[in-house]
């Protein structure tokens, strides 16, 4: 196993060309890609094929400044039993990220101001990622209720209300900022009854 492959496997299967400033190292990466030992994820980012099919991948390296949201955040906060179909990652609306179709990542384009609140740092499977917090995740469920289905939205709200560490004041603040306060109020009234 050469130095490139050793470094890739020791870092969870993903390397960047910035880690290898030498031209000869770059050529080794290109040759490893040609042999099928590495897959080009995007410009300057390469991965060992097996790493892409793990249950968790290094989102921060593939989509820098991306925020894990929706299904993955609901699963992390134990708000939903729905298995995430892919990694849901929010990025700024004006930003363009080229994603190969083999990666199980679904991008959501949010306004910049919506990416600046309700976000926390989490360590999952040895990777540091940014993810929406519990209250923000509930508001996102209400916001995307027509896309995800009313059953999933109701499940998220019901499970949130059962949590001991819920923060209804913060939930109301986030709902106002995301313009879903009235809809959330209706769901909360129904769930409490």
Model regions: which residues?
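Nucleic-acid-binding surface
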Residues: 11-19, 28, 33, 45-193
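A short, conserved structural fragment
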Residues: 36-43
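Alpha-helical residues within the helix-turn-helix
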Residues: 22
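Short amphipathic alpha-helical interface segments
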Residues: 1-15
């Amino acid at each position: 196993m050469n130095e490139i492959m050793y470094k890739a496997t020791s870092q969870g299967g993903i390397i960047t060309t910035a880690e290898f400033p030498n031209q000869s190292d770059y050529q080794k990466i290109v040759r490893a890609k040609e042999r099928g030992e590495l897959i080009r994820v995007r410009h300057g980012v390469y991965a060992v094929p097996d790493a892409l099919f793990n249950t968790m991948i290094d989102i921060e390296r593939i989509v820098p400044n991306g925020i894990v949201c929706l299904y993955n955040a609901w699963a992390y906060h134990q708000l939903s039993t729905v298995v995430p179909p892919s990694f849901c990652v929010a990025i700024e609306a004006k930003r363009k990220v080229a994603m190969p179709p083999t990666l199980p990542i679904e991008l959501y384009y949010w306004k910049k101001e919506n990416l600046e609140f309700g976000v926390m740092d989490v360590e999952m499977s040895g990777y540091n990622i940014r993810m929406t917090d519990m209250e923000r995740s509930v508001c996102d469920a209400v916001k995307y209720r027509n896309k995800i289905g009313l059953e999933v939205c109701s499940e998220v709200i019901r499970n949130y209300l059962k949590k001991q560490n819920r923060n209804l004041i913060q939930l109301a603040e986030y709902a106002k900022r995301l313009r879903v306060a009235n809809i959330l109020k209706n769901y909360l009234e129904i769930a409490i009854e």
